[in-house]
């Protein structure tokens, strides 16, 4: 599939706003889109879906096997998409400790031309050195256009264009400074798309700005250039948690990877959804229950009072149904959760741990996992960890994973398992072996 990547020299350059505006503008033009987010981020894909009307897949070149990334891109083509629009993560060449797994690696793997969004608010002629350096840093990554962001005036724009002219890298557009084109944030990144009351208006405004200030025909020329890679349709996927998987999905449990659901369905699993915040129970015939991450610390009181949900999960665990929680889901499986105000809320009590959001500490990075039992996965896994909550009390129980960081440093054992119930703070992305 043809497409392009929106990347930047650093986080905070405006690439998410540009990506959303372009997705909505291209949708209005009738393009059938395949939105992609590089890396493990859960929040941006929901915005991509809102802008494009299509589910967004995470493609993570550190945590995913290259053949899985290729297969997922092939799946998007099968669904009828014509233009893949990828948003990079952090700076273009930023990855794990060794630099691997960057947006540049994904662009190379999928042979995507890169459009570089540069924050010009505090520079003029120096932009030439920056763009030249990025364009020369890796010859296998092609920067085929630049979008100037946060331009102060027509004079400022003329200076920037003049500085870049000798480089031969096309300037696709210049976006004026506009505080209205910013998205609200909180501790794990942007506020979730479903909680952004004015999102539709924002997306339309962003699309209008892109149409007015970006040469859309020149952008189309970039993504229509010949492709050189062959996508693979069939590749081994992670085993599903069960044959009939009930997945918690609402504002408290919003962090789940689309590629996992797609892979589980390909392996024959049925997936249903339920909302703990609405006090819904999982389907009675589910043989596995998945509580993904999200923001349980923001909804702890409602979860504590969701009697139907709590009873159903407890009964399922007593019957031996697989119950698996990741990050926020892991916290909900514990005994209590302390919110930011220091109030303790009773959780499901299926795992012997107590967690706190009042005593915050950042835990962030890619993880290599060796499963220790309790899940259908017996091969090494790749995962991501990102949370501020801390474990304040933990009783003895079997561990779920042996953990190393991206550099291979031993981080000890993590997660808990009691009977058919298990969980950890790790977000599993893919396996790193030969067999599933």
Curated annotation (Swiss-Prot):
<dbReference type="InterPro" id="IPR011698">
    <property type="entry name" value="GATase_3"/>
</dbReference>
<dbReference type="Pfam" id="PF07685">
    <property type="entry name" value="GATase_3"/>
</dbReference>
<dbReference type="InterPro" id="IPR002586">
    <property type="entry name" value="CobQ/CobB/MinD/ParA_Nub-bd_dom"/>
</dbReference>
<feature type="active site" description="Nucleophile">
    <location>
        <position position="327"/>
    </location>
</feature>
<dbReference type="InterPro" id="IPR004484">
    <property type="entry name" value="CbiA/CobB_synth"/>
</dbReference>
<comment type="function">
    <text>Catalyzes the ATP-dependent amidation of the two carboxylate groups at positions a and c of hydrogenobyrinate, using either L-glutamine or ammonia as the nitrogen source.</text>
</comment>
<dbReference type="GO" id="GO:0005524">
    <property type="term" value="F:ATP binding"/>
</dbReference>
<dbReference type="Pfam" id="PF01656">
    <property type="entry name" value="CbiA"/>
</dbReference>
<protein>
    <recommendedName>
        <fullName>Hydrogenobyrinate a,c-diamide synthase</fullName>
        <ecNumber>6.3.5.9</ecNumber>
    </recommendedName>
</protein>
<comment type="pathway">
    <text>Cofactor biosynthesis; adenosylcobalamin biosynthesis; cob(II)yrinate a,c-diamide from precorrin-2 (aerobic route): step 9/10.</text>
</comment>
<dbReference type="GO" id="GO:0042242">
    <property type="term" value="F:cobyrinic acid a,c-diamide synthase activity"/>
</dbReference>
<keyword id="KW-0436">Ligase</keyword>
<keyword id="KW-0547">Nucleotide-binding</keyword>
<feature type="site" description="Increases nucleophilicity of active site Cys">
    <location>
        <position position="427"/>
    </location>
</feature>
<dbReference type="GO" id="GO:0043802">
    <property type="term" value="F:hydrogenobyrinic acid a,c-diamide synthase (glutamine-hydrolysing) activity"/>
</dbReference>
<comment type="similarity">
    <text>Belongs to the CobB/CbiA family.</text>
</comment>
<dbReference type="InterPro" id="IPR027417">
    <property type="entry name" value="P-loop_NTPase"/>
</dbReference>
<keyword id="KW-0067">ATP-binding</keyword>
<keyword id="KW-0169">Cobalamin biosynthesis</keyword>
<dbReference type="GO" id="GO:0009236">
    <property type="term" value="P:cobalamin biosynthetic process"/>
</dbReference>
<keyword id="KW-0315">Glutamine amidotransferase</keyword>
<dbReference type="InterPro" id="IPR029062">
    <property type="entry name" value="Class_I_gatase-like"/>
</dbReference>
<feature type="domain" description="GATase cobBQ-type">
    <location>
        <begin position="244"/>
        <end position="435"/>
    </location>
</feature>
<keyword id="KW-0460">Magnesium</keyword>
